[in-house]
């Protein structure tokens, strides 16, 4: 607060450019005699009125970022706007000739006349009261800003040197805290990079995923082919197989009846066994061959289906490539 109170009243915003960019340049080799700070146009004319022709001064402009050159002409005082460019050069408004500094501009027009009037600059107009210069407020504020910045730097260095090592270690945040802050303040760019890395991993895993899906589809197609072969065999021997199945059902029904009878009459099982053997022997050889072929194909189908992994269609859908899934929320136009 003490340093803030020592600062002079702040300058108008239109003069900030001079304090921050021009004050040090003008003061490097001494403030020139022709510089007069922020005096008004009327004050400049009053100072030049009693001076000889060609007497000039340069003042800080109130209307633009730059200066104003005022000099004594034959019948009046003339005023020229001096524009400053971003690279530090200066020139009269509307003139194509640029100069490296105000000193260079003044030196040039002391030798070359100012167009279109053809008048030369002759001598500089000094201060009316050298003990009370009119640019004091500009450089006072600039010096105060420099001193305030230096005192803040010095104060920071003193605090760092006087801080004990224990307190410094306590004040030093841990790596986990830094990680938490970093994760909490994650920017959209970081999120986009993470999403891009995930997408790249999914793209790299596409060959393995497609290979797994291909293997499952191949196994299921093999099982379907076995079923189709079994149906073809059944169609080739349709009539005998049907009759054999009907005979088997008849024999099964007879066997069940025989079992019921045997429970009621235990003396008949031997007769039933003999009748069943006679019935099997009376079957045609072609029927027995067809029936055994169907049973063989049925065993192959059962073994093929039992050897394959169970199908889990939701899981297979989960292995689909990324371009077939709904777009993520950060996708353009989503």
Curated annotation (Swiss-Prot):
Protein name: Hematopoietic SH2 domain-containing protein
Broad class of where this protein is predominantly found: cytoplasm
Function: Adapter protein involved in tyrosine kinase and CD28 signaling. May be a modulator of the apoptotic response through its ability to affect mitochondrial stability.
Entry comment on modification after translation: May be phosphorylated by FES and ACK1.
Tissue occurrence: Predominantly expressed in spleen and thymus. Appears not to be expressed in heart, brain, liver, kidney, embryo, lung and ovary.
Chain segments carrying region Disordered: 157-181, 254-280
Organism: Mus musculus (Mouse)
Chain's gene name: Hsh2d
Subunit (UniProt): Interacts with FES and TNK2.
């Amino acid at each position: 607060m003490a340093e803030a109170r020592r600062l002079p009243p702040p300058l108008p915003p239109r003069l900030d450019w001079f304090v921050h960019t021009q004050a040090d340049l003008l003061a490097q080799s001494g403030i020139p005699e022709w510089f007069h700070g922020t005096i008004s146009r009327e004050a400049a004319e009053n100072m030049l009125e009693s001076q000889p022709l060609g007497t000039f001064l340069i003042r800080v402009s109130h209307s633009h970022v730059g200066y104003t050159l005022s000099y004594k002409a034959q019948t009046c005082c003339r005023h020229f706007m001096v524009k400053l460019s971003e690279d530090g050069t200066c020139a009269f408004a509307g003139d194509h000739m640029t100069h490296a500094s105000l000193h260079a501009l003044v030196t040039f027009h002391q030798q070359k006349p100012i167009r279109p009037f053809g008048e030369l600059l002759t001598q500089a107009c000094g201060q009316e009261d050298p003990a009370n210069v009119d640019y004091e407020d500009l450089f006072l504020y600039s010096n105060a800003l420099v001193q305030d910045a230096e005192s803040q730097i010095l104060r920071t260095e003193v605090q760092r040197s006087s801080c004990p090592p224990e307190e410094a270690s306590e004040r030093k945040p841990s790596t986990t805290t830094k990680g938490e802050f970093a994760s909490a303040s994650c920017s959209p760019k970081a999120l986009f990079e993470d999403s891009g890395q995930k997408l790249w991993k999914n793209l790299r895993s596409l060959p393995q995923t497609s290979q797994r899906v291909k293997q499952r589809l191949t196994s299921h197609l093999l099982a379907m082919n076995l079923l189709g072969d079994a149906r073809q065999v059944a169609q080739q021997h349709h009539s005998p197989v049907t009759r054999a199945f009907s005979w088997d059902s008849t024999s099964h029904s007879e066997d069940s009846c025989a079992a019921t009878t045997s429970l009621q009459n235990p003396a008949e099982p031997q007769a039933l066994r003999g009748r069943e053997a006679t019935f099997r022997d009376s079957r045609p050889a072609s029927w027995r061959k067809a029936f055994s072929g169907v049973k063989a194909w049925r065993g192959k189908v059962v073994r093929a289906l039992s050897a394959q992994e169970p199908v889990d269609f939701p899981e297979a859908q989960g292995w689909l490539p990324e371009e077939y899934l709904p777009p993520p929320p950060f996708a353009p136009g989503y």
